[in-house]
Amino acid sequence: MRIDVVTIFPDYLRPLELALVGRAASRDLVDIQTHDLRAWTHDVHRTVDDSPYGGGPGMVMRPEPWDAALRDIVARDPSRRPRVVVPTPAGVPFTQSYAAELAEQDWLIFCCGRYEGIDGRVVDAWADDEISIGDYVLAGGEVATLVMVEAVTRLLPGVVGNAESIIDDSFAHGLLEGPVYTRPPVWEGRAVPEILRSGDHAAIARWRREEALRRTCRRRPELLDRIELSDADRAVVASTIVAAHGGGDDPPVTGVEDAVTIAERGTIGDGPAPSGCASSHCS
């Protein structure tokens, strides 16, 4: 894969030379090039911004340098067409599935805006994707680009030594990954769950699935609405609700039918569904 990044702060992207992404580049699994947008300016001050039409605070990045930069970069490999990405808080959310989609591409160009953003005409003319990494505002697109490039690169074949690491990632199956443990077996009085030391691979897989369901229900309940849950999964979700309510006035969940009834009813005892688990499976 080829990745080009256009920015007014090329040094901001130097972390891409380190760790996993840096090793991938050194092994020619990905070719990452950064470009200084100011190289495509033609005035003594190397100006890339101007005041916004319609008034308002801040400055807007001018279209001419961006268009010149993108034309020049694309012309260097006319046999391929890149997918152009603009990081912006006004974009669609970046997700693991989005990372997987981008990882299927042959060539990506990231356009790192600054100030109030890039002139909308450039975005309309060039951008294939406008992507947000979260509901907050950064000073520019560089940090978001670092996030996306790492998320995409680690999905490329051969980048991660153990491919199962990717399969077991948070979000790989639509759920958050559960807790992980290593040696020593007991630390500061806290023991590793016995099941993980049992050698029973089927039981360990079930435990991990259940922990992933519990963590997702507590922290990102909306994710549960996007996946198909088995009856056993729904039992775990329902028991998580019961625990969040301290049991309420309901009898214990003793089987799948009880769990499904509770999950579909949406309340336990006379209390509302817990704020920590607000998906349709949990509330």
Curated annotation (Swiss-Prot):
S-adenosyl-L-methionine binds at residues 113, 133-138. The keyword Methyltransferase applies. It is found in: Cytoplasm. GO terms for biological process: tRNA N1-guanine methylation. It is an enzyme of class 2 (transferase). InterPro entries: Alpha/beta_knot_MTases (IPR029028), tRNA_m1G_MeTrfase_C_sf (IPR023148), tRNA_m1G_MeTrfase_TrmD (IPR002649), tRNA_m1G_MTases_N (IPR029026), tRNA_MeTrfase_TRMD/TRM10 (IPR016009). Keywords: Cytoplasm, Methyltransferase, S-adenosyl-L-methionine, Transferase, tRNA processing. It catalyses: guanosine(37) in tRNA + S-adenosyl-L-methionine = N(1)-methylguanosine(37) in tRNA + S-adenosyl-L-homocysteine + H(+). GO terms for molecular function: tRNA (guanine(37)-N1)-methyltransferase activity. GO terms for cellular component: cytosol. Its EC number is 2.1.1.228. Pfam families: tRNA_m1G_MT. Gene3D superfamilies: 3.40.1280.10, tRNA(m1g37)methyltransferase, domain 2. HAMAP family: TrmD. Specifically methylates guanosine-37 in various tRNAs. Belongs to the RNA methyltransferase TrmD family. Homodimer. This is tRNA (guanine-N(1)-)-methyltransferase. It comes from Parafrankia sp. (strain EAN1pec).
